[in-house]
Amino acid sequence: MPHTVLYVPVPGLEPYIRWRHEEEGPEWLSPDPGHIHAHVTLLGPFAPQSDLTPELVADLTALFAAAPAFDFVLEEIRVFPSGLVHLHPEPAWGFAELTAALTARYPAYPPYAGEFAPVPHLSLCALGPGRDVELVHDELRHLLPVRARAQHVHLVRYEPHGTRVLRTYPLGTGPVLSEARASTS
């Protein structure tokens, strides 16, 4: 079923993530060759595409404009109890703050539909026959660490054979929320 997700793209890991999608879920590959599949999710699933009104788009624009861009590093490979192998961003606070702000603003869309805690991460692959953590370490040895900057957020529609970016929101282009509050007091 089609759904939307808000995420921070991580171009430095795109070759690996694209390859993993080709192996584990090719139907989710975007037909757009410039699409960045490697990402850290902020909120998903998000609003159905039919609910993306001009007011909602404007609200997201303002929310992200008030959030500062930030640097992060992806180096530490971890595994969730479900067997999902992922990279943990350091520092994680920027992702956690954005997710908390989105969750507070849009309580009808809890992170991961309320099934999992909103732990910032970049999904790599699932453990399974012939795929263990040591193999993932070996595959990523030449790519890690990845130093990146969260500068914008993509609103992406996921649909089999039709995944695409609907909108891109820059971070930090407006007054930061705490600065805006200070200037009005």
Task: Name the predicted role of every residue range.
Residues 1-71, 92-151, 164-185:
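Basic, often amphipathic N-terminal segments
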Residues 86-87, 124, 155:
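Short hydrophobic/aromatic-rich beta-strand segments that constitute the beta-sheet cores
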Residues 83-84, 98:
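Short, conserved acidic/polar surface loops in the N-terminal third of protein domains
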Residues 89, 158, 171:
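Active-site donor-binding loop signature of nucleotide-sugar glycosyltransferases
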